[in-house]
Amino acid sequence: MLEHLSSLPTQMDYKGQKLAEQMFQGIILFSAIVGFIYGYLAEQFGWTVYIVMAGFAFSCLLTLPPWPIYRRHPLKWLPVQDSSTEDKKPGERKVKRHAKNN
């Protein structure tokens, strides 16, 4: 059963993370406003809490799993380059010198 879980994608790109954060905050804010208004009109603070908790659960369901909508802009990594500085002796390396500010 665990091999099925390891095949699931777990990454989100940066734009997907931003979208997920905006959606999460928007849903929480909307549910808080609706919950406050309904709780005020019904004169029941419990309904306010229930509506906010339902909004939180709904936003978690929409934003925590890495849905395909959050993976539309994958990162393009640079190819691996051989570092030739490891092969050089200390005397052969270029020394970087910084200009002194007066």
Curated annotation (Swiss-Prot):
Sorted UniProt keywords: Endoplasmic reticulum, Membrane, Transmembrane, Transmembrane helix
Compartments in which it is found: Endoplasmic reticulum membrane
GO cellular component terms listed in the entry, alphabetical order: signal peptidase complex
PTM info: May be phosphorylated.
Chief localization: endoplasmic reticulum
Stretches in topological domain Cytoplasmic: 1-19, 70-102
InterPro entries in the cross-refs: Spc1/SPCS1
Annotated transmembrane regions: 20-42, 47-69
Entry keyword annotation includes Transmembrane helix: yes
GO biological process: protein targeting to ER; signal peptide processing
Record carries keyword Transmembrane: yes
Family: Belongs to the SPCS1 family.
Subunit description: Component of the signal peptidase complex paralog A (SPC-A) composed of a catalytic subunit SEC11A and three accessory subunits SPCS1, SPCS2 and SPCS3. Component of the signal peptidase complex paralog C (SPC-C) composed of a catalytic subunit SEC11C and three accessory subunits SPCS1, SPCS2 and SPCS3. Within the complex, interacts with SPCS2 and SPCS3. The complex induces a local thinning of the ER membrane which is used to measure the length of the signal peptide (SP) h-region of protein substrates. This ensures the selectivity of the complex towards h-regions shorter than 18-20 amino acids.
Function: Component of the signal peptidase complex (SPC) which catalyzes the cleavage of N-terminal signal sequences from nascent proteins as they are translocated into the lumen of the endoplasmic reticulum. Dispensable for SPC enzymatic activity.
The protein, known as: Signal peptidase complex subunit 1
Organism of origin: Bos taurus (Bovine)
Gene name linked to the record: SPCS1
